[in-house]
């Protein structure tokens, strides 16, 4: 039961980080329709993180992007944000360190 509350709290915290990021960096108004569950992965390499970070700087949906440092841990957390109209639904996946101190990459 405690684990369930911890994961709900982490999901809420991740959603708040993404909402704040969108509010601060979006180049247009983004209508967020939903978020996935918060999950973890160990398959994202440092080189893939670097590529995602470089691509994030070129993403025209966001401006003046500032990302957190790449963590030493091999475990990352991620959440998918869905936005847009039903016929044009799009998504971005945001990656965090395991302590949710900030967004470290997105795609």
Residue map of PLM features:
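Sec-dependent bacterial lipoprotein signal peptides
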Residues: 1-8
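Cystatin/cathelin-like cysteine-protease inhibitor module
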Residues: 8-107
């Amino acid at each position: 039961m405690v684990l369930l509350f911890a994961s709900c709290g982490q999901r809420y915290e991740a959603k708040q980080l993404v909402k704040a990021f969108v509010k601060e960096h979006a180049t247009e108004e983004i209508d967020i329709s939903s978020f996935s569950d918060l999950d973890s992965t160990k398959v994202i390499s440092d080189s893939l993180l670097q590529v995602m970070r470089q691509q994030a700087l070129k993403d025209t949906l966001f401006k003046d992007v500032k990302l957190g440092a790449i963590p030493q841990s091999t475990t990352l957390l991620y959440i998918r944000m869905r936005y847009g109209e039903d016929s044009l639904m799009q998504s971005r996946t945001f990656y965090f360190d395991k302590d949710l101190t900030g967004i470290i990459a997105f795609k």
